[in-house]
Amino acid sequence: MASATEDPVLERYFKGHKAAITSLDLSPNGKQLATASWDTFLMLWNFKPHARAYRYVGHKDVVTSVQFSPHGNLLASASRDRTVRLWIPDKRGKFSEFKAHTAPVRSVDFSADGQFLATASEDKSIKVWSMYRQRFLYSLYRHTHWVRCAKFSPDGRLIVSCSEDKTIKIWDTTNKQCVNNFSDSVGFANFVDFNPSGTCIASAGSDQTVKVWDVRVNKLLQHYQVHSGGVNCISFHPSDNYLVTASSDGTLKILDLLEGRLIYTLQGHTGPVFTVSFSKGGELFASGGADTQVLLWRTNFDELHCKGLNKRNLKRLHFDSPPHLLDIYPRTPHPHEEKVETVETTETSGRTLPDKGEEACGYFLNPSLMSPECSPTTTKKKTEDMSDLPSESQRSIPLAVTDALEHIMEQLNVLTQTVSILEQRLTLTEDKLKDCLENQQKLFSAVQQKS
C-alpha cells in the first residue's frame, strides 16, 4: 500500500475554455497539453512558467477528440461538424481539414508509428486513413449504433472500438475483419483502449463500471464498480500497473491492476469529469470536465512500479477471475487545494483545404504539415540507400516479417513464463501430496499400535 508521501497531488490549474472539456492529450515530450471543448476550440497549453496558451479556431461545432501524433509534430482533432483537422502545434496553428464521415466524428487515434489515423463516427463506422499516402484507406462496418471510440493496439495489428449498440469489437487491420466481439446487456462503453503491452483492453462504461478484458483468451479479467456515475474515460499508466478513470460523479479514481483494487479517489472538479490521460512517461496525468477547468496532477505513486514488473508479468498469465470489487471500500478521498494558473491566450486560425471526399485521390494534408511520420519524401530518403525494390508491397515484406518474428518471440516469452508457473504449481502439489502421504502413514501406524 502506498504511503501518504506517494499520493498524487494537483500540480497546476488551467482555465481558458468557455465550455466543458471533452478530450485532452499530453505531448510525447511532456511539455505541452492539448485540450478540446464544447466551445468549438482547441487549446494548446505550454508548461513553461508564464508561457502563452494558443487557441485554435476552425471547427464549426463541438470538438470531441484530440491527440498528438507519436512524434508530437502533428495534432489531430475530431468534431461534430463531421470533419477531422490536422494541426501544427505551434503559435500559427496551420491546419488541413477533410470531411471524414457523414455524421459527427467522435474520436481520432494515431497508430504507434504515426503512419495511420483511425476515426470513429456516429455514422456507425470506423475509418482508417494513411498518413503516408495522405488518403482514405478503408472503412470498418459491423456496429449497429454510434461508434464512440476507436483505438489502435500498440503494434498496429488490431483496432478496438466501442459503440452505443452495447458491443466492443476487435478488428484485424490486415484483413479488415471483426475478429472478436464483447457484448454487455446493461450499458454501453463510452471509451475503450489497449494497455501498453497490447494484451488487454479496458472499457469505461455508462453503467458505472470499468472492465478489463484479456484479448488473448477473450476473457473478462477484472470488473470494477467504484463510481456512482457513468465512467467517461480511462487511461493506462505506461507501466501497465495502474488505470485512472474519469466519471460523471465528479471524481477521478486510480486502480491498482496488480492487486485488483481501488487505491485513490481524487476530487478537484466541481462537476462531471469527461476526460483523463497519463503522460507518455507516466509522471503526470491531466483531467478535464464540465467545469471548464483542466487539472494537471503529479502521479508520485508510480516511482515504485519497477519493483512490480516481475509480479506484473506473472499476473498477466493468471486467467482466473479476481475478486469482485463490490465490497472493496476506497480510501478517504483526497481533496486538493486548487492552484490557479493564469495563462495568456493567443487566437490562431488556419487555411482550409477544399473538400475532396473520402474516396478522392488527392492528398488531404497541407504540404506545410508534412512531417517525418507521414512524409513520403522523408521515408524515401531513409530507405533509398537500403533497397531499390520497385513496389510498395515488396518494400513492406521485411517489416511484416520483422513484426511477425517479434510477435512470435513475445508469445514464446509468455509460454516460457507459463511453463515456469506450471512447474512451480506442480512442485507445490508434489510437496502437499508428500505431506498427505506422510500424515496418512503416521495415522496408519498409530491405529496399528492401538490395536
Swiss-Prot record:
Post-translational modification: Phosphorylated in mitotic cells that may be mediated by CDK1.
GO-annotated biological processes: cell population proliferation; centriole replication; cilium assembly; positive regulation of centriole elongation; retina homeostasis
Coiled coil: 404-443
Location relative to the cell: Cytoplasm, Cytoskeleton, Microtubule organizing center, Centrosome, Centriole; Cytoplasm, Cytoskeleton, Cilium basal body; Cytoplasm, Cytoskeleton, Spindle pole
Annotated region (Disordered), positions in chain: 372-394
Keywords: Cell projection, Cilium biogenesis/degradation, Coiled coil, Cytoplasm, Cytoskeleton, Phosphoprotein, Repeat, WD repeat
GO CC terms of this entry: centriole; ciliary basal body; cytoplasm; spindle pole
Signal peptide coordinates: none
WD repeat windows: 16-55, 58-99, 101-139, 142-181, 183-223, 226-265, 268-307
UniProt modified residues of type Phosphoserine: 321
Entries under InterPro entries matching the protein: G-protein_beta_WD-40_rep, WD40/YVTN_repeat-like_dom_sf, WD40_repeat_CS, WD40_repeat_dom_sf, WD40_rpt, WDR55_POC1
Pfam families: WD40
Assembly, per entry: Interacts with POC1A. Interacts with FAM161A. Interacts with CEP44; the interaction is direct and recruits POC1B to centriolar microtubules. Forms a microtubule-associated complex with POC5, CETN2 and FAM161A. Interacts with CCDC15.
PANTHER family: POC1 CENTRIOLAR PROTEIN HOMOLOG B, WD REPEAT-CONTAINING PROTEIN 55
Family: Belongs to the WD repeat POC1 family.
Function: Plays an important role in centriole assembly and/or stability and ciliogenesis. Involved in early steps of centriole duplication, as well as in the later steps of centriole length control. Acts in concert with POC1A to ensure centriole integrity and proper mitotic spindle formation. Required for primary cilia formation, ciliary length and also cell proliferation. Required for retinal integrity. Acts as a positive regulator of centriole elongation.
Entry protein name: POC1 centriolar protein homolog B
Provenance organism: Pongo abelii (Sumatran orangutan)
Gene transcribed to yield this protein: POC1B
